[in-house]
């Protein structure tokens, strides 16, 4: 369910911060909103954001979640974007919808490599074994951080943006 217009910004910001977690080396980029119908969810966002500028753009599918993706760009302070997610497989997103219904389901993060140099205590607390194999997503190559429930919400780390070459 989409929040009321005056609650949209604070509600989405709170969900994104909660899912991003306390790690200061990870910056939340966009909140993923699970839905069974992209068009209906976009219409609901437009209705809730009446008075705010909003644009949408279909994005590449997310292989890790098994989702079709549509990026919503808004003028809501603090929440410039949201990513609508509709399952196209019986994968992670379908499980999330079955268990939790529509709503916040994922957050995409970027890692600040300068925050913790390799070998530091904080870097050692997030072992590579807790990350999925890389896959393609709406923002480039990504990995799932396996530190939450199997049915979500999910934390997805962008490891290479489109057009970048990974070693």
Show the residue positions of the predicted features.
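Vicinal oxygen chelate
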Residues: 1-27, 61-65, 69-88, 106-110, ...
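N-terminal domain-onset segments
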Residues: 12-51
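Amphipathic alpha-helical segments
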Residues: 37-54, 113-125
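A structural preference for short, hydrophobic beta-strand core positions in alpha/beta folds
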Residues: 56-58
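Zn2+-dependent peptidoglycan hydrolase active-site motif and core
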Residues: 93
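Donor-sugar nucleotide-binding helix/loop cap in glycosyltransferases
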Residues: 97-98
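Long, folded non-catalytic interaction modules
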Residues: 102-103
């Amino acid at each position: 369910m989409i929040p009321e217009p005056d609650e949209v910004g604070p509600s989405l910001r709170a969900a994104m911060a909660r899912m991003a977690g306390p790690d200061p080396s990870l910056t939340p980029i966009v909140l993923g909103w699970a839905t069974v119908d992209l068009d209906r969810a976009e219409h609901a966002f437009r209705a809730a954001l009446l008075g705010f500028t909003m644009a949408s753009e279909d994005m590449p599918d997310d292989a890790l979640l098994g989702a079709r993706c549509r990026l919503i760009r808004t003028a809501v302070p603090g929440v410039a974007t949201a990513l609508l997610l509709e399952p196209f497989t019986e994968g992670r997103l379908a499980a999330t919808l079955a268990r939790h219904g529509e709503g916040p389901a994922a957050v995409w993060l970027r890692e600040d490599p300068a925050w913790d140099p390799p070998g530091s205590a904080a870097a050692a607390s997030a072992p590579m074994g807790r990350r999925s194999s890389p896959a393609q997503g709406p923002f480039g190559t990504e990995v799932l951080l396996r530190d939450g429930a199997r049915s979500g919400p999910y934390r997805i780390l962008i490891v290479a943006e489109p057009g970048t070459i990974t070693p």
